[in-house]
């Protein structure tokens, strides 16, 4: 986010966080039908690059790039960027089954289409587990059948809920679905096979057993006699004398 005046590091972090939250909310509202699943902001000295991750990148770009240009103009006007200092790019989600936002949006549209709650939830669970996830949890709450609200939880596989591994390995998303009987809350949590960060981390309960080193062959023990320097010199002279005698013969 560009600023003409210098601010402290603390205020800079807060301003960047607010900017990212507002930008993410804006894209969530504008690109919900295109399968929006997150964005990444890269700031360079000359311009700011915003990478939009979605399942349908062609719809994000639009015909001849019209939609992406409209979004660029809206972002530039909303966040007061200077002219030609912000660019938007569309990136396709590599694995939809391991993206909680994409699966949450998929479940949302299934419920809007009138699909049964259990069938929609189990379809998401099956798709996520087939994609290679360690575990998945789907929670749907609201007026599901009767007039009284309740919550239904569907889970499969392995799921952790606390500690630093929950931050590194859990991808979660929450959406709201407006139906005729009221608003439903949808939450999807996915236990990833690898951490979200690029650092190689493992769960604390995983024990890695290293292969044993190859044993060196045991040699026969021997004794080393340390002789004094004078005795060693005399022994050396005797050996030389014996060699000279042998040569003379």
From Swiss-Prot:
Q: Which Gene3D superfamilies match?
A: 3.30.300.20, Ribosomal protein S3, C-terminal domain
- Output the Pfam families linked to this UniProt entry: KH_2, Ribosomal_S3_C
Q: Which domain of life is it from?
A: Eukaryota
Q: Which GO terms describe its cellular component?
A: cytosol; cytosolic small ribosomal subunit; nucleus
Gene Ontology molecular function, alphabetical: RNA binding; structural constituent of ribosome
Task: Report the residues modified as Phosphoserine.
Answer: 32, 37, 106, 141
- Which is a GO BP term held by this UniProt record? cytoplasmic translation
Keywords on record = Cytoplasm, Phosphoprotein, Ribonucleoprotein, Ribosomal protein, RNA-binding
- What residue stretches are annotated with the KH type-2 domain? 23-94
Location of the protein in the cell: Cytoplasm
Q: Which family does it belong to?
A: Belongs to the universal ribosomal protein uS3 family.
This molecule's function is given as: Component of the ribosome, a large ribonucleoprotein complex responsible for the synthesis of proteins in the cell. The small ribosomal subunit (SSU) binds messenger RNAs (mRNAs) and translates the encoded message by selecting cognate aminoacyl-transfer RNA (tRNA) molecules. The large subunit (LSU) contains the ribosomal catalytic site termed the peptidyl transferase center (PTC), which catalyzes the formation of peptide bonds, thereby polymerizing the amino acids delivered by tRNAs into a polypeptide chain.
Protein name according to UniProt = Small ribosomal subunit protein uS3
Q: Encoded by which gene?
A: rps3
């Amino acid at each position: 986010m560009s600023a003409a005046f210098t601010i402290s590091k603390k205020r800079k972090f807060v301003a960047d966080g607010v900017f990212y939250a507002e930008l993410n909310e804006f894209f969530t509202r504008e690109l919900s039908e295109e399968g929006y699943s997150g964005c990444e902001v890269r700031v360079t000295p000359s311009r700011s690059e915003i990478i939009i991750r979605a399942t349908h990148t062609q719809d994000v770009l639009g015909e001849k790039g019209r939609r992406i240009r409209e979004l660029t103009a809206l972002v530039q006007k909303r966040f007061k960027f200077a002219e030609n200092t912000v660019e938007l790019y569309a990136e396709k989600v590599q694995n939809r089954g391991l993206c909680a936002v994409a699966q949450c949006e998929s479940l949302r549209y299934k419920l809007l289409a009138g699909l049964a709650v259990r069938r929609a939830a189990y379809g998401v669970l099956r798709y996520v587990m087939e994609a290679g996830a360690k575990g998945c949890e789907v929670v749907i709450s609201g007026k599901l059948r009767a007039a009284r609200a309740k919550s239904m939880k569907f889970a499969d596989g392995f799921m952790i809920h606390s500690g630093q591994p929950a931050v590194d390995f859990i991808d979660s998303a929450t959406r709201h679905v407006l139906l005729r009987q009221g608003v439903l809350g949808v939450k999807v949590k996915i236990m990833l096979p690898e951490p979200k960060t690029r650092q190689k981390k493992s769960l604390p309960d995983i024990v890695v057993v290293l292969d044993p080193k190859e044993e060196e062959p045991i040699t026969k023990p021997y004794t080393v006699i340390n002789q004094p320097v004078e005795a060693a010199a005399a022994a050396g002279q005797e050996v030389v004398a014996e060699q000279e005698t042998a040569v003379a013969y």
